[in-house]
Regions:
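A short alpha-helical cap/connector motif
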Residues: 1-158, 165-186, 191-229
């Protein structure tokens, strides 16, 4: 799989996960089509039934968005990266590769703090990250991110929000004070689920809250926000 990483070992793992994700996407399409047909479809992607269904699914960030995460992390020299929603570790691999490459180039230390509420997913993520050779740059915290992220261990350079929508704003409330000046925050799918994300977008789009924010209208939309002084 060709990515911006230029890392054959990581790309082999990503290719396997991409294939697994494609198979699961077909299954997910059938699931949501059936729901629509039976008029039970809800726009709330975090409903109990949906949560059960996606419990063992990758629902990984799109490769282009992962490439962008890598590139932005490299651009700002990110060393402390936090991710809300690790799943099987796809985006984590990109983030960890960025931190590793920054450390290789400039020396010092760096870490990606992943968060995953499903212990089995966290185990699988750890195995995938190890296979990609990136374990020294990742710590996956198992549990509810609203708790596990209360102390990220220092000023955070980059935050990826890619998880269940109703929890994104509460996690942002935990993380905002821990972001360094100039930190970047990426939040996925804000256009596709515009209404559901309104509590989050109204926060980051209001300069009074200390952020400047833009929407990248691509594949469901990606909100990119910068923490100001
Ligand atoms: C969209 S997936 C993340 C995909 C991942 N970023 C990737 O690219 O592979 C969202 C993940 O968030 C996890 N999650 C849901 N609620 C959580 C919570 N309260 N704390 C931590 N993780 C949670 C889910 O189990 C799921 O695996």
């Amino acid at each position: 799989m060709k990515t911006v990483l230029c890392d054959a070992r990581a790309e082999a793992v990503l290719a396997r996960l991409d294939e697994q994700g494609r198979q699961q996407s077909a299954e997910m399409r059938r699931y949501y089509d059936a729901k629509r047909e039976s008029a039970k479809r809800t726009t709330d992607p975090a409903s109990k039934h949906d949560m059960d269904f996606v419990r063992d699914k990758l629902v990984a960030l799109d490769p282009e968005k992962c490439d962008l995460c890598y590139t932005l992390c490299r651009a700002i020299g990110a060393r402390r990266v936090v991710e809300f929603g690790t799943s099987f570790g796809v985006s984590t691999i990109y983030l960890a590769a960025a931190v590793r490459d920054t450390v290789r180039e400039r020396g010092g230390e760096g870490i990606v703090i992943g968060t995953e509420i499903e212990p089995r997913k966290a185990e699988i993520a750890a195995a995938n990250i190890a296979e990609a050779g990136l374990s020294p740059f990742v710590e996956v915290r198992v549990g509810d991110a609203r708790e596990t992220l209360k102390n990220a261990g220092g000023p955070v350079d980059f935050l990826l929000l890619d998880s269940w929508i109703p929890l994104v704003r509460p996690v942002m409330d935990v993380m905002a004070p821990q972001l360094r000046r100039g930190a970047m925050v990426l939040c996925d799918n804000v256009e596709k689920y515009e209404r559901e994300y309104s509590d989050y977008t109204s926060f980051v789009r209001d300069p009074k809250n200390g952020f400047r924010s833009v929407l990248l209208s691509h594949q469901g939309g990606l909100e990119i926000s910068i923490k100001l002084g």
